Amino acid sequence: MIFGHIAQPNPCRLPAAIEKALDFLRATDFNALEPGVVEIDGKNIYTQIIDLTTREAVVNRPEVHRRYIDIQFLAWGEEKIGIAIDTGNNKVSESLLEQRNIIFYHDSEHESFIEMIPGSYAIFFPQDVHRPGCIMQTASEIRKIVVKVALTALN
């Protein structure tokens, strides 16, 4: 996992596909876009613009992805995201790996939380369990941008 703020320069060189995704986040006015999917580089890099209300962590299920990495960016609002390394000991709640490239767990072993504010981003790789959309202080309306980068696009 990589955690940062879009206003800060990248501390090191990242794969070109991730740099392209971060450049898109820096250059886009998300207030001007409706929720939905925007392709950046076909199915190699695309984004989901999502408006939601944060919920208690116990209501949200931890998740992992196997074919894409997630770059989760907060445009407005505030949220916590649960994070952990996938130890292989988490009980599967629902597997939609073939249909949607997602596995949900009942819970997440050794979970910590990061706090997201507008401009924050977190990059989740296949071994990173994450539980997005959790309340920080109180329920909050947020706009979250999730950029999906195909593992095959990394070089």
From Swiss-Prot:
<dbReference type="InterPro" id="IPR037012">
    <property type="entry name" value="NanQ/TabA/YiaL_sf"/>
</dbReference>
<protein>
    <recommendedName>
        <fullName>Protein YiaL</fullName>
    </recommendedName>
</protein>
<dbReference type="Pfam" id="PF04074">
    <property type="entry name" value="DUF386"/>
</dbReference>
<dbReference type="GO" id="GO:0005829">
    <property type="term" value="C:cytosol"/>
</dbReference>
<dbReference type="InterPro" id="IPR004375">
    <property type="entry name" value="NanQ/TabA/YiaL"/>
</dbReference>
<comment type="similarity">
    <text>Belongs to the TabA/YiaL family.</text>
</comment>
<dbReference type="GO" id="GO:0009314">
    <property type="term" value="P:response to radiation"/>
</dbReference>
